[in-house]
Amino acid sequence: MQALWPLLLSALPALLGASSLFVEKESNGSRICKPAPQWEIDGKTPMKELLGNVVVVALLKASUHFCLTQAARLGDLRDKLANGGLTNISFMVVNEQDSQSRAMYWELKRRTAQDIPVYQQSPLQNDVWEILEGDKDDFLVYDRCGYLTFHIVLPFSFLHYPYIEAAIRATYHKNMCNCSLNANFSISESSDSTKNDPAGENNQRPNSTEPVTAAHHHHHQQHEPHHHHHNPYPNSHKKSGDSDVTGKPKEPPHHSHQEHVHNHR
């Protein structure tokens, strides 16, 4: 498999760009290599705080059984990349805003590796999923400057497929959006300049506020065995309900039992 990575990395951008299933809504035009939108949860701005890192944002729904499986696999993917020498890659999960998903937040948190933050939206804030123009099981990958490199949707976002890992590796190894961290722009400056620069001439700025989008095709997929890798984070699979998020519900005295997880829409 290692010998196939260079070929897969070189082919992935063309493959994704050629398929509206992967990346874009045709009506909105291409938003790849455009700045990420600014969003916050209880005053925190995760994308701004993580400038300089490759960032992977997973939109997962706590009330969806298969989403819980996806969450459980994130730690293994992160560890696999770290074991391969890929550092400064930050993962995060944003739970859905509806009441059922908020009620099951702690189960999503429990399934996710301890040091991967799980953000819970409050019912009155602007919906982060809408800001990102994303949907359940979408993965958005941003480069070190905060530019979108991939917005991968179902069925390609299933973590037992190679597409998410390949997109992260391509973003890590290739300067796909002419990212330069030498420029000194604030989030608001980057947003204003981008709006006045539809041709993308100034896309080397590190900060951003424009949304990105994807088409969404929903399929059912059977849960597959979970493969384990050596973990450089000794406590990464010990789940904690006391960190990483704001605006979250009170932790219940007992966790709900762990279901056998299947994908559904």
From Swiss-Prot:
Signal peptide coordinates: 1-18
Composition bias, Basic and acidic residues: 239-265
One Gene Ontology cellular component annotation held by this UniProt entry: extracellular region
Localisation: Secreted
Listed Polar residues bias regions: 201-211
Keyword list, A-Z: Glycoprotein, Secreted, Selenocysteine, Signal
InterPro entries: Selenoprotein-P_N, SeP, Thioredoxin-like_sf
Principal subcellular localization: secreted
Pfam families: SelP_N (PF04592)
Location of the region described as Disordered in the Swiss-Prot/TrEMBL record: 188-265
Biased composition regions of type Basic residues, renumbered to the chain: 215-231
PANTHER family the record matches: SELENOPROTEIN P (PTHR10105), SELENOPROTEIN P2 (PTHR10105:SF4)
UniProt function note: Might be responsible for some of the extracellular antioxidant defense properties of selenium.
Protein name: Selenoprotein Pb
Lineage of producing organism: Eukaryota, Metazoa, Chordata, Craniata, Vertebrata
Gene assigned in the entry: sepp1b
